[in-house]
C-alpha cells in the first residue's frame, strides 16, 4: 500500500481517524531489488521479511548469498507462535522468504527441507509434490521429515 492509498482512505473516511492515525509507528519502504529497479517476488518478499534488499531470484539471502534473518525468526525467539498461510505453494518465493535461505528461488527441494527444519507453528498451503520421494532428487520422502518435526500433514480438504 502506498501513500496514495492512505490518502484515498482518508478521503473515504471523511478525514476521520484511521488505523494509520492510531498506529504508534508506520514506515515507508521500497522493495526494488539490489540489482534491478523492477523486483521479482523473491527479492520483494526477502525485503519485507528480512529488512534487507537482495538480488532478483534470491530468497532469504543477501546479495552475497549470506542468510538474512527474518522477522519470523525474531518472533520465534520471542516465543510467539508463527505461521505461513498461502494459496500458493509453501515453497513459493513470497512465503519462502520468511523461513528459507537459498540463492535461487526455484530450489524447491531445499526450500521444502528448510520448511521441515523450521520452527513455524503452522504452515498452510500447497507444494506437497516437493516433499514426495518420487519428485525429489534424493528420493527421501520430505513428508516424513515434516512429520518427524511434529507437523501434521494434511493432504485432503476433508481432513
Which sequence ranges carry the predicted segments?
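N-terminal catalytic scaffold of extracellular/periplasmic and nuclease hydrolases
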Residues: 1-158
